């Protein structure tokens, strides 16, 4: 069977020219040359989203125009007048199939044109690659796949009457009535047509990709024309060993490999470094309900260089004689006492303080005498402080005592209803600077109290007098130690003077106490070394305090930070 011979290319493929005689008898020759042929395109379809994913014909077609002038009898001597010729040129592109197809009897009309984009281009006079007029089509797309050609039709608009055709009628360009608009008298005349070589329109699956921009496109773009320049290769390679239509996007591989970065082993400077755990001995007990806050405060104490709170152990009775006034090292702790029948003895109003995590102090086997000056009762286990008073921002404990008349009968209710912590801080020794941390040894404060040394000057020194020694108060309740050890699991007793009343109503209640009733008049934290009796803070009395003031105006008894009880005139009554 004989094969069909290939179709002969049309005579106007790539190049075409035409000549005409002007009214002055000169011969003008128009020559079109398709300098950059279209090679490939991707079908964009005809749907609603076709314009969003449209690929232009690659490379963009570029057609060169040259105009020559010569004598009608001498075609050898031609003069290039492309830049000097005064006229407007337009090139209109259409699409046709490369292989003509016979039409059917009832061929339906196409619903939409196959060629889309901008099919019209004006002339651009450029100096490179040569001085000529150029028509550029950077935005041409084809909707359906197949093999096509582009037809370029040249139209001219003459501006001077001498350049019109020799047989054309003379038209008056003057307007007799300038005030009235006149119909346009300019006309576009068709000059010639040129076709491109066949190119293939691929489907989206088979499209090989866009190639690198050609040198002609770069030269044209450098002179200000709108041409898309692609400096990277976007051709997809097909595998040689496979026969199916597998497309390999090399550019995608390059882009993904460029995103891979070596991990920084030195760490990013902007990433916050996690703070190490605190080495303080005030670790959080698992049963403590405020463990998160306790960890935060213990870490803050380590961060500022403070020593964490040590578990308080009851020291041995001190020997007679003066003790060192400034002792910054805590006493060596004794073995802790075994837990009582209520190991979860905690205050529900401690508000983040960590004093309730320490075991209760152990009682001595015999009652204390006046010479030993035993530590009085505390609703919370006592512990020594080793922090800077200028940076203290945590809640302190209120400085109120408890009435002796109700102490023996209501001692068993202390483990059930946690009492508020005390707020009073121990007095500073005479030879200790105000900026240094307070000593954590109770013996140091004991010796200072025995010698009745004056306190260091504070902003409220005029309001708080020196405290007398309390040796006479230690023997008021000799039998309370044995009674309280059986009911409150080895808790020290109060050392109160006779006739002293308490500020707190410690009776059992059916509901929780309010914050105001628990913390008394000073319900704010202490900052910059302030004391609870400083006038900088307003005094706000609780209901129990106001009831006490109405009943008596006697001295009040309060507990010192080192465990001793002291009496003085209430500042609110002065």
From Swiss-Prot:
Keyword Zinc: no
Region described as PEST: 457-501
Effects seen without this gene: Reduces the production of penicillin.
Positions with biased composition (Basic and acidic residues): 513-525
Position of sequence motif Nuclear localization signal: 39-44
Stretch list, region Disordered: 1-22, 39-60, 255-500, 513-540
Compartments it resides in: Nucleus; Cytoplasm
One BP annotation, GO: positive regulation of penicillin metabolic process
GO cellular component terms, A-Z: cytoplasm; nucleus
Compositionally biased spans, kind Low complexity: 459-474, 482-493
Keyword annotations from UniProtKB, A to Z: Cytoplasm, Nucleus, Sporulation, Transcription, Transcription regulation
Residue ranges occupied by any Velvet domain in the UniProt entry: 25-230
Compositionally biased spans, kind Pro residues: 314-323, 330-341
Highest taxon of the lineage: Eukaryota
Compositional bias segments (type: Polar residues): 343-353, 385-394, 406-415, 448-458
InterPro entries listed in its UniProt record: Velvet, Velvet_dom, Velvet_dom_sf
Family designation: Belongs to the velvet family. VeA subfamily.
Record's subunit section: Component of the heterotrimeric velvet complex composed of laeA, veA and velB; VeA acting as a bridging protein between laeA and velB.
Domain comment in the entry: The C-terminal PEST domain is a region rich in proline, glutamic acid, serine and threonine residues that is required for the light-dependent regulation of development and secondary metabolism.
Function: Component of the velvet transcription factor complex that controls sexual/asexual developmental ratio in response to light, promoting sexual development in the darkness while stimulating asexual sporulation under illumination. The velvet complex hat acts as a global regulator for secondary metabolite gene expression. Controls the expression of the penicillin gene cluster.
Protein known as: Developmental and secondary metabolism regulator veA
Originating organism: Aspergillus oryzae (strain ATCC 42149 / RIB 40) (Yellow koji mold)
């Amino acid at each position: 069977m004989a094969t069909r011979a290939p179709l002969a290319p049309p005579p106007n493929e790539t190049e075409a020219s035409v000549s005409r005689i002007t009214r002055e008898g000169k011969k003008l020759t128009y020559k079109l040359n398709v300098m950059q042929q279209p090679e490939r395109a991707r079908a964009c379809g005809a749907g609603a989203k076709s314009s969003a994913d449209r690929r232009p014909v690659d490379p963009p077609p570029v057609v060169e125009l040259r105009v020559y002038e010569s004598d009608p009898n001498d075609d050898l001597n031609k003069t290039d007048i492309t830049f000097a010729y005064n006229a407007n040129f337009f090139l209109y592109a259409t699409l046709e199939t490369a292989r003509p197809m016979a039409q059917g009897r009832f061929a339906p009309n196409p619903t939409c044109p196959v060629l889309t984009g901008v099919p019209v281009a004006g002339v651009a006079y450029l100096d490179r690659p040569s001085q000529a007029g150029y028509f550029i089509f950077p935005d041409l797309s084809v909707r359906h796949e197949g093999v096509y050609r582009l037809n370029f039709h040249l139209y001219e608009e003459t501006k001077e009457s001498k350049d019109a055709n020799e047989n054309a009628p003379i038209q008056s360009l003057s307007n007799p009535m300038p005030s009235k608009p006149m119909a346009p008298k300019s006309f576009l005349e068709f000059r010639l047509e040129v076709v491109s070589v066949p190119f293939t329109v691929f489907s989206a699956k088979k499209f090989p990709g866009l190639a690198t921009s050609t040198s002609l496109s770069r030269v044209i773009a450098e002179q200000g024309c709108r041409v898309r320049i692609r400096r990277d290769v976007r051709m997809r390679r097909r595998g040689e060993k496979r026969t199916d239509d597998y497309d390999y996007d090399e550019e995608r591989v390059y882009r993904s490999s460029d995103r891979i970065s070596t991990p920084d082993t030195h760490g990013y400077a902007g990433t916050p470094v996690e703070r190490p755990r605190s080495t303080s001995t005030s670790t959080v007990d698992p049963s403590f309900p405020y463990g998160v806050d306790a960890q935060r405060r213990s870490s803050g104490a380590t961060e500022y260089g403070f020593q964490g709170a040590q578990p308080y152990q009851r020291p041995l009775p001190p020997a007679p004689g003066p003790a060192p006034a400034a002792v910054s090292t805590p006493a060596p702790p004794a073995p802790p006492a075994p837990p009582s029948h209520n190991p979860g003895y905690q205050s529900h109003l401690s508000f983040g303080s960590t004093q309730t995590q320490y075991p209760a102090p152990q009682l001595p086997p015999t009652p204390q005498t006046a010479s030993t000056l035993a530590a009085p009762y505390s609703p919370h286990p006592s512990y020594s402080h080793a922090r800077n008073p200028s940076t203290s921002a945590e809640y302190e404990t209120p400085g109120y005592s408890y009435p002796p008349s109700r102490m023996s009968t209501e001692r068993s209710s202390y483990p059930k209803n946690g009492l508020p912590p005390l707020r009073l801080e121990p007095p500073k020794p005479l030879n200790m600077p105000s900026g240094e941390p307070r000593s954590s040894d109770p013996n140091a404060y004991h010796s200072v109290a025995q010698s009745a040394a004056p306190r260091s000057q504070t902003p409220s020194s005029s309001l708080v007098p020196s405290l007398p020694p309390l040796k006479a108060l230690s023997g008021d309740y000799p039998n309370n130690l044995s009674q309280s050890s059986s009911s409150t699991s080895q808790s020290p007793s109060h050392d109160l003077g006779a006739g002293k009343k308490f500020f707190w109503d410690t009776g059992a209640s059916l509901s929780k106490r309010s914050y105001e009733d628990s913390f008394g008049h000073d319900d704010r934290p202490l900052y910059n070394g302030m004391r609870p009796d400083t006038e900088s803070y307003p005094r706000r009395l609780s209901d129990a305090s106001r009831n006490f003031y109405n009943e008596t105006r006697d001295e009040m008894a309060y507990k010192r930070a080192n465990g001793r009880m002291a009496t003085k005139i209430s500042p609110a009554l002065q």
